[in-house]
A protein has these predicted regions:
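Residue-level signal for short hydrophobic patches within transmembrane helices
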Residues: 7, 11-30, 34, 57-64, ...
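Transmembrane alpha-helix boundary and packing residues in multipass membrane permease domains
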Residues: 21, 25, 37, 74, ...
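Helix-terminus/linker motif at the lipid-water interface of multi-pass membrane proteins
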Residues: 30-49, 118-125, 181-188, 248-281, ...
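Small-residue-rich hydrophobic transmembrane alpha-helices
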Residues: 48-108, 145-164, 271-335, 366-385
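Short runs within selected transmembrane alpha-helices of multi-pass transporters and secretion channels
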Residues: 138-156, 164-172, 193-208, 287-290, ...
Length: 448
């Protein structure tokens, strides 16, 4: 189960680690789309809206859990790189204990706030009951979502990105089968979609726990490893909390941008919604690079091979930026046909094309700052990732979207460029932070 990523070809390790991670992200996207697709076949518009709104809430929550789990990936990765099995076991056990308590507490809070959450999301009156039913069941499954992501973070910290891919594949297959049972055969509507999702997570967690217990070459856990230790939990949270807050606030920012688009009318709102889905799919590559740099970089830092960690960063930036440039050039010629894959409305296609042409440049800049974020996490400075992302959101993304929407009512192109400009600011901040760290000798704590 444990894989040493501190030797061999740096580029080869990046490819071998990132491809399963990339496919995992793809499966998670498919997982989320399955509920909407299937309920759209069997329910009315209110049922589809309920699942759509509920899915947005759960997506935001899941991203925050994944961000928080980054602390486990990095700390375990550093321990593995240092060949310190005892520390790796303690970080693993404390992570599981910490997140078990947090998930139960969060579940209780969310269940108490389910109706206010539906109201904050501006859920249409016809879909409120379905949204509440969907969220209640999904909230009961929060401990399962947390458990899956923690187990996945442990495996990735050990250098294994394949097994988490298998676990999400199991969940995806079970979810689709249960959706057809609960929504199609039993006509349970949004509640059926939520029940299918929750039970699929339960199956995935059961499989992942069985694999973790039987896998050879993994971490041997004892009862003492699960005993809370303030220093260990503090280090996990110091890395994970900034990422979780960052991901949550970014999702809130995107909700603001959605509101801004909605005020432009139905056509522009539909165009923005479609382009957001296209971009989220294309961003799978930068996202996989972030996770790859954090996991591989953490092992290299733990092994005292800081120069190799830097090589991992540069190779990942080359891959992510190269992908961004390629896809940006292609989209300039095929923007409208790509948007047309999701709608037959000519007006929506005409509005979405320019927006996609501007927004796609974000793939270039985001690919760079995602890699820097992964590196900052690997060296235990995740607060830098938080700072550059939130600064870009507050100073450029949201105000830029508002101002361009107001002063350019005839086209969405400037609104798309404003989003890319936010990522450009993030790149500038990342480069400055990197140079400052290098000047103060904070990038090379060890040599190898």
């Amino acid at each position: 189960m444990e894989k040493n990523l501190t030797t061999g070809s740096v580029f080869g390790n990046i490819v071998r680690f990132s491809l399963p991670y990339l496919f995992s992200y793809f499966l998670q996207t498919l997982y989320g789309m399955a509920d909407l697709f299937i309920i759209g076949q069997y329910a009315d518009a209110s049922g589809t809206t309920a699942v759509s709104v509920g899915s947005q809430v759960m997506h935001m929550l899941t991203l925050m859990i994944v961000g928080l789990a980054m602390g486990a990936t990095v700390t375990i990765g550093q321990a593995v790189g240092a060949r310190d099995q005892k520390s790796a076991a303690r970080y693993t056990g404390n992570t599981m204990s910490l997140f078990l308590v947090l998930s139960v507490a969060v579940t209780g809070l969310l269940l108490a706030l389910v109706r206010p959450i539906a109201a904050v999301m501006s859920t249409p009156a016809e879909a409120v009951s379905g949204t509440v039913a969907y969220l209640r069941i999904c909230f009961l499954g929060v401990p399962l979502i947390t458990e899956y992501n923690i187990i996945a973070s442990v495996f990735r910290g050990l250098g294994d990105s394949k097994r988490p891919m298998y676990f999400i594949a199991v969940a995806c297959a079970v979810n689709i089968a249960l959706d057809y049972l609960f929504i199609g055969a039993l006509h349970m509507g949004p509640a059926g979609a939520a029940l299918g999702t929750t039970l699929a997570q339960a199956v995935s967690v059961a499989v992942s726990l069985a694999v973790m217990r039987s896998a050879r070459g993994g971490i041997a856990l004892t009862r003492d490893d699960f005993r809370p230790q303030r220093a260990i939990m503090g280090r996990i949270l110091r890395i994970g909390v900034p990422i979780a807050l960052q991901d949550g606030l970014i999702q809130i920012a995107f909700l603001f941008i959605t509101v801004i688009a909605n005020r432009r009318g139905l056509t522009d709102a539909a165009a923005v919604g479609i382009v957001e889905k296209i971009i989220s799919f294309l961003f799978l590559v930068p996202s996989s690079m972030l996770s790859t740099v954090s996991a591989l970089g953490a092992q290299c830092i733990g092994a005292g091979k800081s120069r190799r960690a830097l090589q991992t960063l540069w190779y990942a930036i080359a891959v992510a930026f190269g992908f961004g440039v390629l896809i940006s050039v292609v989209i300039q010629f095929v923007a409208e046909p790509v948007v047309a894959l999701f709608t037959h409305d000519a007006a929506v296609v005409a509005a979405g094309g320019p927006y996609l042409r501007g927004y796609i440049l974000d793939c270039c800049f985001a690919g760079v700052h995602f890699c820097f974020s992964g590196y900052f996490c690997a060296i235990g400075r995740s607060e830098l990732s938080f700072v550059h992302n939130i600064t870009a959101v507050v100073l450029v993304r949201v105000p830029g979207a508002y101002l361009t929407s107001r002063y350019f009512p005839a086209t969405l192109l400037p609104m798309g460029l404003a989003t890319a400009a936010g990522s450009l600011l993030s790149v500038i901040i990342c480069v400055i932070a990197f140079l400052v760290l290098r000047r103060h000798g904070k990038l090379l704590p060890g040599e190898g």
